[in-house]
Amino acid sequence: MKKIALLLLILGAGIKGYTQVNPDSIEIIRGPYGVPHIYAATDVEVAYGFAWAQAEDHFKLIQEAYIAGNGILSKHIGLKGAGADFLVQFIQAEKTVDAQFHTLDKKFIALLEGFTQGLNAFAKKHPKEILKNELFPLTPKKLLRYTQLQLFISNGADKLVKGIVNNELSWPYEIEQDTKGSNLLAISRSRTQSDETFLAINTHQPLE
């Protein structure tokens, strides 16, 4: 098993955390198949370590998601990103997050803060991998803006907007009733100690 000890400094100026994270107390242990297991004294530190491990595996993908969620995708990929930027403005993601942020549980906000600190620390450690400097430092609100866009698209509302813009929306509009999921994982029996095949699904969204 590969054991990685995080010996990092928390980003100083520019990050006002809800809770202090001690990176020295965080361990990321990867199993034989590379799956990261995070060990730390607090949930917030686990969130920090989780963010770091995720960034190790796909920092580019994480950035692209938050770039889109914060309305700057066209600055990254050009005109192809204009649609996502339009949707972010259309749903008023920033305004919604600012207005509702105070309703969130402080413990949840602390987890978001730990996660963002982990990503920011990784970005500072690997500056050449940063796609858009404008995205950093990440904050809990920036994460939540992406969530607004994600939920909007996951529920198919972007298709409604497209229909309205192109004047192609028929009435009455029928919503698709089929259930969808994502991250469907099939694990071969050759990779399990019990010699069994497993099928796991992470839907992200409610099935009802």
Regions found by a protein language model. Name each.
Residues 22-208:
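Substrate-recognition/specificity elements adjacent to catalytic centers across diverse enzyme folds
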